[in-house]
């Protein structure tokens, strides 16, 4: 099996192109690929690229202090944001409220299912979730401001029943965080709070022809990981980045003695 490519965060940031759709993992202050997002923000501030990104995420990410999703909160860096929870990234919210970006709020659980449907090359996620709410296109379709025009949600009828179709789209890049990776890119999440969609997100990006980049705590010898703990098989992973201890938690707390050894 071929060994995975190991990059610095700065090198990984160069893999994101203008106009890409990028999905980021994480849940509030946990399991966020902070080193990757910081490096991408730094590149944009220094060079003006990448720009016009579409940012896609389910759970809110960050600590309302410039971390997580707020690394993308710069005019010109993103043109569209599709998220399940916006509260953790006030800079992104300000861009939406000032009509500087196209902005959508879709149900968080639906976005989790969208990753799976994108991976499966389905046309989208069909569900009753969101009917007659803000996500229903008859009530705005999740659009958050006046410059957001495209309908990402459609009402369909199946067997005489109304459902919502949340349309699928390709993902060009995914930033994920895991605990350990082996030399072949197999990644565990045993030291995170949970898997948080990482398997489906990696599959969705890989099956879109995109680039899967995973931030980890450390790289271990191939064959040393318990296969039952592997959440992201190496066949989905393009590059690994080893993050610093400061990037393990957005609230800067690290208690290694309380973590489960592998």
Report residues per predicted region.
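Fold-independent oxyanion-binding glycine-rich loops
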Residues: 9, 25-27, 32, 53, ...
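ATP/pyrophosphate-binding catalytic subdomain of soluble kinases
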Residues: 99-188
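N-terminal active-site beta-alpha-beta segment that forms phosphate/nucleotide-binding
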Residues: 2-108, 258-259
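Solvent-exposed alpha-helices and their adjacent loops that cap or buttress functional pockets
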Residues: 5, 14-15, 45-50, 72-75, ...
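Terminal amphipathic helices with adjacent charged low-complexity linkers/tails
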Residues: 220-250
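Conserved acidic residues
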Residues: 79, 170-172, 210, 238
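Single conserved hydrophobic/aromatic residue that forms the stacking wall/gate
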Residues: 252-262
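Gly/Ser/Thr-rich active-site loops/lids in small-molecule metabolic enzymes
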Residues: 186-210
């Amino acid at each position: 099996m071929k060994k995975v490519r190991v990059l610095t965060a700065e090198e990984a940031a160069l893999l994101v192109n203008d106009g890409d759709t990028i999905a980021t993992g994480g849940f509030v202050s946990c399991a966020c690929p902070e080193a990757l997002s910081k490096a991408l923000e730094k590149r944009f501030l220094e060079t003006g690229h990448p720009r016009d990104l579409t940012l896609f995420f389910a759970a809110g990410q960050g600590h309302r202090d410039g971390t997580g999703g707020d690394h993308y909160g710069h005019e010109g860096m993103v043109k569209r944001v599709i998220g399940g929870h916006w509260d953790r990234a006030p800079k992104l919210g300000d861009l939406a409220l000032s009509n500087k970006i196209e902005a959508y709020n879709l149900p968080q659980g639906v976005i989790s299912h969208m990753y799976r449907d994108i991976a499966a090359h389905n046309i989208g996620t069909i569900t009753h979730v969101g009917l007659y709410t803000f996500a229903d296109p008859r009530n705005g379709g999740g659009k958050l401001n006046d410059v957001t025009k495209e309908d990402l949600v459609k009402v369909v009828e199946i067997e005489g029943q109304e459902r919502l179709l949340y349309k699928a789209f390709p993902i060009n890049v995914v930033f994920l965080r895991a605990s350990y990776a082996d030399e072949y890119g197999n990644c565990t999440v045993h030291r995170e709070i949970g898997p948080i969609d990482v398997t489906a997100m990696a599959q969705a990006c890989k099956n879109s022809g995109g680039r899967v980049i995973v931030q980890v705590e450390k790289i271990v010898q191939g064959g040393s990981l318990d296969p039952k703990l592997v959440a992201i098989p190496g066949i989905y992973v393009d590059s690994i980045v080893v993050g610093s201890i400061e990037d393990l938690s957005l609230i800067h707390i690290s208690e290694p003695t309380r973590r489960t050894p592998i």
